[in-house]
Structures are given as C-alpha cells and as structure tokens.
Amino acid sequence: MKTFAPSYLKHQFLIAMPHMADPNFAHTLTYIVEHNANGAMGLVINRPQELNLADILEQLRPNEQPPASTLQVPIYQGGPVQTDRGFVLHSDECSFQATVALEGLSLTTSQDVLLAIAAGVGPKKSLITLGYAGWEAGQLEAELADNAWLNCPFDPEIIFGLASDQRLGAAAASLGINLSLLTSQAGHA
C-alpha cells in the first residue's frame, strides 16, 4: 500500500479567498515562513499600517532622531499574533543576530536589521512587519480543505517589486485567477 507524505506550504504564498470572513485575513496575501506537522507560521505582506520605520526607531531609541529616509519605510501588519514583535523579511545578502535563512530570502527578528536599514547599510530589499499569522497542527490544512485559501509559488518580485495593494492580485494572476470572478461555493471530488 502506498503512503503519502504530507504536503507542506513553506516558502509559498497563501491567497485569502474572497469569502474569507476572518477580518485578520480578509483580502490578504501571506508568505509562509514555516509549515510542518506542528503547525504553520506566516507573515501577511499586503497590509501596511499607519506606522513607518521612524516610528519604531523613536520607540527603540527615544533620544535619537531617526534618519528622514526611515519615514518612507512602511511597517506591515504581519498577523494577529504577537503584534508587538517585529519580523523583517529581506534579501539574503546579509545576516544579523537573529536571522533565519529561507530559500533565497531571510527572516530576521533582531533590532540590528532595523538599525542597518535606517543607516542605509541593510539588506537591499526588505519588508518589516509587526506580528505574525500562526496555525496549530492541522489547522491550516483544514482551512485549505474548506477553501479559505489558495496557495501559489513564492515570487520575490511580488513582495519587493510591487506596491502593497497590487500583491494579492498579482499572486492570484500568477495562477491565472481573477479573484473577483471566484465564488464562495466549491465542490470536492
């Protein structure tokens, strides 16, 4: 008898289906950082907050004036879990105190990456989030079976080359899908 290994979605995008009712994830595009038998972790990459890197640096170093360039670096709502914790997805040409290498991408959670970005010596491409999306064991698989999400291959151009309001549509288009034409009804064979 053949056994099947589970299929995990690490290093892929999750596209929220148009009927997603959870306000934390409606109309979101999420990069999956980790997915295994214990659960999944991802970062929502298309929800900018009304914060920028200057705001964060003012909290970290209240006695120092952040560089003017940091006013142009948006902070994204990465998900509803630990919303006071920062996560930086970035190109992999440099690493920092708390950097995890992903496939052609890195994730850093230490403050030194923020200071490097502010000083103009950080990674060439980056996206900063507060919070993350987390799923318990089997939860994401159940949501996929309920047609809450579509998954598609990761494309760094979608994260780093497009405006936040274009990312969700671009990810769907990479599958040949127009989200506005989808229905909430689905069949299972």
Swiss-Prot record:
Transmembrane segments: none annotated. InterPro entries: AlgH-like. GO terms for cellular component: cytosol. Pfam families: DUF179. Signal peptide: none annotated. Belongs to the UPF0301 (AlgH) family. This is UPF0301 protein PSEEN5058.
